[in-house]
Structure formats: structure tokens, C-alpha cells
Design a protein with these regions (language model features):
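Glycine- and acidic/polar-rich repeat regions and solenoidal domains
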Residues: 1-8, 13-248
Length: 248
């Protein structure tokens, strides 16, 4: 689809790579759909795999959809230049070998709102054999986190101004929210991606195994959230190194 489209009350099953794909996807309305079993062709590294994958999404609304059993792909991936979008009232369930449920990439301008969703069970996609062994107390003294394990509810890559509000995010293999800057992803005279000014407000985080929230820097905010069945140090600020592992 190329913008100005409505996708409503469809059942999309067993798409090998992508359920709904869009370019220059302005003014999209995607609502009341069931999208399940996407990604069985194991093409996540092809860059275009997702139950919904849109480029340059502007003024879009994605609401009241059910995503189930997406395999090695994102439930939603908004790629580059996304502004004034709302993702609301969706169920994101059982991401199989899934790196993240929602991926917002390379978005420097404008606010995007993710609110009132349930994100549940994001398994992660990584090789367990590569997880460093930390016998005894050796893990206490490391100066940075290893980057092997993933499995995020929401992942922002080089993305600013996310608003994440009133969501239930649970059973994520790594973190409910994770973001990182992409400092050198600059085109022409544009700046790189900084991943600042995210606000996480009034969410419930349940049993995210490494941390509830991993912020790249202090230039982000978490306020009024509830943390259930989390381990110590479940609020993390990763840069500048060494990371700090905090709680309320």
C-alpha cells in the first residue's frame, strides 16, 4: 500500500515474510484485523519482515488489531521518517524467536504514540551459546552489558520523541523497552539518530527478564509505571559507560 488507504477487518494468516507492507505510507488506517503466523519463511534478516512493515509512516493510526505467533519478524515495524502515528488498543501476542514486538526505526522528527496495548511474550532471537559465562561474582564487575540477548516489547533505533503510555508489557526475554542511538546514520547534512526524549508513562511491566526499561541516556523519562516480578536493577541507563542499574 502507498498511503491514504484503509485496511479493516481482514484476516491475514501465514504470510511468509510480510502481512501488510507500505511505502510512503501517509494517512493510513489499519484497524480490527487479525494477523497471525507471519514470518514462517525466516526472512527477518531480509530487512522487510513483519506483520505490518511501513516506511515513512505519517499521520497513521493502527488500532484494535490482534497479532499472534509472528515468527522471526516484528509485529509492527515502522521504518524511517515516521511522524504523528498512533498505535493503540492492539494485542501483540507470542512473538516466536522475535527480536522485538514493535520496532520504530530512524525517526528524528515528530512524536509517535504507543498507548493502551498489550504486548505479551517476546522470545528473542539469538544464539544462547554466545551468552558470556559469568561464574561466581565476575558479572558484578563488568563495565558494559553484553549485547547477545534480545527480546524487547518496544525497540527504538535512532528514534526520538516516542510516547509510550498505559501499556501492559510482559514476558520479554530482555526488556520491555530498549533504545539505542545510531550516531553515524546520517544522510547528507542530516544528523544521526540520538534516541532521546522518550517518555514512558503509566505502563505496567511484568517479568521482563533482564530489565523493564533500558534507556540509552538520561535524556529520556519514565514516570508512574508499575513494575511486577522484575529482578534488581530493572531500570537501566546504558550510556555513558559504565551503565547504571537502578530501581524506584
Amino acid at each position: 500500500v502507498i498511503g491514504h488507504s484503509v485496511v479493516r477487518r481482514c484476516t491475514i494468516k501465514d504470510a511468509g515474510v510480510c502481512g501488510i507492507a507500505g511505502l510512503f505510507a501517509a494517512h493510513m488506517l489499519i484497524e480490527d484485523n487479525l494477523i497471525e503466523g507471519t514470518g514462517w519463511q525466516k526472512m527477518e534478516l531480509s530487512w522487510e519482515a513483519g506483520a505490518i512493515k511501513l516506511h515513512n509512516s505519517v499521520d497513521g493510526l493502527i488500532r484494535h488489531n490482534v497479532f499472534r505467533n509472528t515468527f522471526r519478524a516484528d509485529h509492527i515495524w515502522l521504518d524511517c521518517g515516521n511522524e504523528n502515528n498512533r498505535i493503540t488498543g492492539n494485542l501483540f501476542l507470542d512473538g516466536k524467536e522475535q527480536r522485538e514486538a514493535i520496532f520504530i526505526e530512524c525517526t528524528r522528527d515528530g512524536i509517535n504514540l504507543i498507548d493502551n496495548n498489550i504486548i505479551w511474550n517476546v522470545e528473542g532471537r539469538f544464539d544462547p551459546k554466545k551468552i558470556p559465562v559469568e561464574p561466581g561474582s565476575t558479572g558484578w564487575y563488568k563495565m558494559e552489558e553484553h549485547d547477545v540477548v534480545n527480546g524487547y516489547g518496544i525497540y527504538g533505533e535512532g528514534t526520538d520523541h516516542l510516547r509510550i503510555v498505559n501499556n501492559l508489557i510482559g514476558n520479554c526475554r530482555s526488556a520491555g523497552y530498549f533504545a539505542k542511538p545510531v550516531s553515524f546514520r546520517a544522510e547528507g547534512m542530516n544528523r544521526g539518530g540520538t534516541s532521546v526524549d522518550a517518555e514512558l508513562i503509566n505502563n505496567i511491566f511484568y517479568h521482563c527478564e533482564e530489565a523493564a526499561i533500558k534507556m540509552p541516556t538520561k535524556a529520556n523519562k519514565a514516570e508512574g509505571n508499575c513494575y511486577v516480578k522484575e529482578e534488581g536493577g530493572y531500570l537501566r541507563i546504558l550510556y555513558p559507560q559504565p551503565p547504571v542499574c537502578l530501581h524506584l
